């Protein structure tokens, strides 16, 4: 057992070696490296696969009951401060290692085909390997210093991947936005880390928890000091995991290549924040104010992400806000003290989201030959529809991931989301209502996304004639009428005219320096198909593999069927102290489970049913009734639906508010400071200098060496002095 643990450091080293090798090759031998691009991709995937098998072995050892293993060595030995580096292997670490490596391998396989046309193919694999290595290093960190270093590397890799197509202004702006937003969180994390070290004198997690709790118990440290440190520390996870109010970077992060959406959403960047809060959970649970703050941040984020996702037209942005909402669930669970439910949802959410993200990439890949390579068209769900008949494998796997995100049994997310909703209801009913409301919204926006993307009729009509396709919540696109009002003032995507276009004119629309133009426009016209085509096997294989954990991973949290039932595998595995102290009766557990599941599944089903009525391919009402209903809704709910749509589509106006307060406010403040510095500070300094200069010039002219000038000055001064004495003689000589 211990022999395999000794090689745990190899897991992050393997992708790091791959990234360094590719980077050095691109720097010193660019032509040779690019000519061997497939070889480098295979090597990167193979090395990460080896790391994945080692991770599975470590996971199996933990399941078998092996104790926590720690390997540490001194990095900076000193009498006052001893900083150690190394790696621990415990249940949470082994879970995250498997998550990161399995999703990383599937993403690399998917990227081999998706990025094959891109000139930055080799560079992409270098960035992806470095990002995976950074996340693996973060996962196995035994102290706050090491975790902070790898956290910064994760942020740097996210900056590189989001801005991969840096020639596009939107991508360049998005990576800067992500980088700056996360720096705000990192500043709070750094202050919190420094405060905890000042209180406890250690960066190691075990020593930190023990000394902090002892200090509180012995009243050696005041809550007025400990609480601010503990409140500053979660700012890092809040920014990294896209929690309100530092969530604004995540939707813009979709400007990067689609394959990176899976590691960003499921296993790399955003999971780092949740992982860090889970690591620090033994410390936070002793501070009620901090736990309450974390729970409310999670609840607000979950509902906000689900609400904003209602009206988004970009397929990848819908998934981004879905990730934000699900991460809010995890943060909510940690805040209410449900460590097991949060860890469970971290596992169960990773695989369905990793399935949906490459699935969206497969959908976009099938749309690009039809509408062109511009993201505004290839990712616009208003131009899709009916794709399931053309891409059946992608459609089936995408539906599976969608149902899991909705929380439909027996898929993965059902088990964990149901537990979070039940625990939040017991902790505080308002949080329980927020969790239930968010579950209904999740069912609505995910099935809205699925219906507009894969059901109905294909709306990107390839005819050269301008044909409008009407997308209404009450009127299917096949039955659009000219009498219907075409505005954006109804429910999400309720009324949008989509003009068709000649795809042959758009086939090279997004052919900047990053995209190979190896196929001429003429050949593109000859090979053009009016309908989307299924992706190749290289892109489909990861989707099929990810369906397995999406179906089965949720059962690790289900108690075994026994007459007297003990703790489930996950509880016993994460921490025996979290297991049920007493045996519970299976019938009682089953009745409670059915009662809770009925509410959560019913709420999600209501959202799914509503989305199916509004956006589904099957008309639920006669055509005349739907037209009359539209007219009635315009008068009754038109204003409200317009406000809701505009608020949701505009991301809650949060970006605009930040732009006014922070960006424009900072610029105005900079101008005021510049004016003050230029005219006040510099004015005083320059005024003193100019006064001295003029004084010197005057003295120089007064001392010219001519006696007549001296005599004139002496007589003038004497006369002035006499006049002063005569005028004020009474004052001087009383």
From Swiss-Prot:
Chloroplast is among the record's keywords: yes
EC number, UniProt record: 7.1.1.-
Transmembrane segments: 9-29, 40-60, 89-109, 121-140, 144-166, 185-205, 219-239, 258-278, 289-311, 318-338, 395-415, 425-445, 539-559, 601-621, 707-727
Annotated GO MF terms: NADH dehydrogenase (ubiquinone) activity; quinone binding
Record-linked Pfam families: Proton_antipo_C, Proton_antipo_M, Proton_antipo_N
Keyword Translocase: yes
Location relative to the cell: Plastid, Chloroplast thylakoid membrane
Gene Ontology terms: biological process: ATP synthesis coupled electron transport; electron transport coupled proton transport
One GO cellular component, as annotated: chloroplast thylakoid membrane
UniProt feature, compositional bias: Basic and acidic residues: 524-534
InterPro entries: NADH_UbQ_OxRdtase_chlpt_su5_C, NADHpl_OxRdtase_5_subgr, ND/Mrp_TM, NU5C-like, Proton_antipo_N
Keywords: Chloroplast, Membrane, NAD, NADP, Plastid, Plastoquinone, Quinone, Thylakoid, Translocase, Transmembrane, Transmembrane helix, Transport
Reaction(s) catalysed by this chain's protein: a plastoquinone + NADH + (n+1) H(+)(in) = a plastoquinol + NAD(+) + n H(+)(out); a plastoquinone + NADPH + (n+1) H(+)(in) = a plastoquinol + NADP(+) + n H(+)(out)
Topology term for the membrane: Multi-pass membrane protein
Region Disordered, residue ranges: 512-534
Broad class of where this protein is predominantly found: plastid
Alphabetical list of Gene3D superfamilies matching this protein: 1.20.5.2700
Subunit structure: NDH is composed of at least 16 different subunits, 5 of which are encoded in the nucleus.
Family from the record: Belongs to the complex I subunit 5 family.
PANTHER family linked: NADH-UBIQUINONE OXIDOREDUCTASE CHAIN 5
Function as written in the Swiss-Prot or TrEMBL entry: NDH shuttles electrons from NAD(P)H:plastoquinone, via FMN and iron-sulfur (Fe-S) centers, to quinones in the photosynthetic chain and possibly in a chloroplast respiratory chain. The immediate electron acceptor for the enzyme in this species is believed to be plastoquinone. Couples the redox reaction to proton translocation, and thus conserves the redox energy in a proton gradient.
Protein's name in the database: NAD(P)H-quinone oxidoreductase subunit 5, chloroplastic
Organism: Huperzia lucidula
Lineage: Eukaryota, Viridiplantae, Streptophyta, Embryophyta, Tracheophyta
Gene: ndhF
């Amino acid at each position: 057992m211990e022999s395999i643990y000794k090689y745990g450091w190899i897991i992050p080293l393997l992708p790091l070696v791959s990234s360094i090798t590719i980077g050095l090759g691109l720097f010193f031998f660019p032509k040779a490296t690019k000519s061997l691009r497939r070889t480098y991709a295979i090597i990167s995937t193979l090395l990460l696969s080896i790391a994945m098998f080692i991770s599975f072995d470590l996971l199996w050892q933990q399941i078998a009951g092996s104790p926590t293993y720690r390997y540490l060595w001194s990095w900076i030995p000193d009498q006052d401060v001893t900083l150690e580096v190394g790696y621990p292997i415990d249940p949470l670490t082994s879970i995250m290692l498997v998550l990161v490596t399995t999703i990383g391998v599937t993403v690399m396989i998917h990227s081999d085909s998706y990025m094959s046309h891109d000139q930055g193919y080799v560079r992409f694999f270098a960035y992806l390997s470095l990002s995976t290595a950074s996340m693996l290093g973060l996962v196995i960190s035994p102290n706050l210093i090491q975790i902070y270093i790898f956290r910064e590397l994760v942020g740097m890799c996210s900056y590189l991947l989001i801005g991969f197509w840096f020639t596009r202004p939107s991508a360049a702006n998005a990576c800067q936005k992500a980088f700056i937003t996360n720096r705000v969180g990192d500043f709070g994390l750094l202050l919190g880390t420094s405060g905890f070290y000042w209180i406890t004198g250690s960066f190691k997690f075990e020593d930190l928890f023990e000394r902090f709790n002892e200090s509180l118990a012995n009243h050696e440290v005041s809550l007025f000091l400990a609480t601010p440190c503990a409140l500053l520390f979660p700012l890092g996870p809040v920014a990294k995991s896209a929690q309100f109010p530092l969530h604004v970077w995540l939707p813009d992060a979709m400007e990067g290549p689609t394959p990176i959406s899976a590691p960003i959403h499921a296993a790399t960047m955003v999971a780092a924040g949740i992982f860090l809060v889970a690591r620090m959970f033994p410390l936070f649970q002793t501070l009620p104010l901090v736990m309450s703050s974390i729970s409310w941040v999670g609840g607000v984020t979950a509902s906000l992400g689900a609400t904003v996702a209602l009206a988004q037209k970009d397929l990848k942005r819908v998934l981004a806000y879905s990730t934000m909402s699900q991460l809010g669930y995890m943060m909510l669970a940690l805040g209410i003290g449900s460590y097991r439910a949060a860890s469970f949802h971290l596992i169960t959410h990773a695989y369905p989201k990793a399935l949906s993200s490459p699935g969206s990439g497969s959908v976009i890949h099938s749309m690009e030959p039809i509408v062109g390579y511009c993201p505004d068209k290839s990712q616009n769900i208003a131009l899709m529809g009916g794709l399931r008949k053309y891409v059946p494998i992608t459609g089936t796997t995408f539906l599976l991931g969608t149902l899991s995100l909705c929380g439909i049994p027996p898929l993965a997310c059902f088990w964990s989301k149901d537990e979070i909703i039940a625990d939040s209801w017991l902790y505080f009913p308002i949080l329980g209502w927020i969790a239930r409301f968010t579950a209904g919204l999740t069912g609505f926006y995910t099935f809205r996304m699925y219906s507009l993307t894969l059901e109905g009729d294909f709306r990107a009509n390839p005819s050269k004639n301008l044909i409008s396709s009407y997308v209404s919540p009450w009127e299917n696109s096949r039955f659009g009428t000219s009498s219907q009002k075409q505005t954006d003032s109804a429910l999400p995507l309720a009324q949008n005219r989509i003009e068709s276009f000649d795809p042959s004119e758009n086939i090279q629309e997004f052919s900047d320096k990053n995209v190979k133009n190896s196929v001429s426009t003429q050949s593109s016209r000859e090979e053009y198909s009016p309908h989307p085509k299924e992706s190749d096997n290289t892109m489909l294989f990861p989707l099929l593999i990810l369906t397995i954990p999406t179906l089965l991973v949720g059962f690790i949290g289900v108690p075994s069927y026994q007459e007297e039932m003990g703790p489930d595998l996950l509880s016993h595995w994460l921490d025996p102290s979290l297991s049920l102290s007493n045996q519970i009766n299976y019938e009682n557990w089953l009745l409670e489970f059915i009662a809770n599941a009925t509410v959560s599944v019913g709420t999600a089903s209501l959202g799914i049913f509503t989305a199916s009525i509004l956006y589904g391919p099957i008309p639920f009402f006669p055509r005349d009734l739907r037209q009359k209903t539209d007219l009635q809704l315009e008068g009754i709910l038109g204003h409200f639906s317009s406000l809701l749509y505009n608020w949701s589509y505009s991301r809650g106006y949060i970006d605009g508010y930040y732009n006014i307060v922070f960006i424009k406010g900072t610029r105005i403040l900079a101008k005021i400071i510049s004016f003050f510095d230029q005219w006040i500070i510099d004015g005083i300094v320059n005024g003193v200098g100019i006064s001295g200069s003029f004084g010197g010039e005057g003295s120089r002219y007064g001392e010219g060496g001519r006696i007549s000038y001296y005599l004139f000055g002496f007589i003038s001064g004497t006369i002035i002095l006499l006049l002063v004495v005569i005028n004020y003689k009474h004052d001087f000589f009383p």
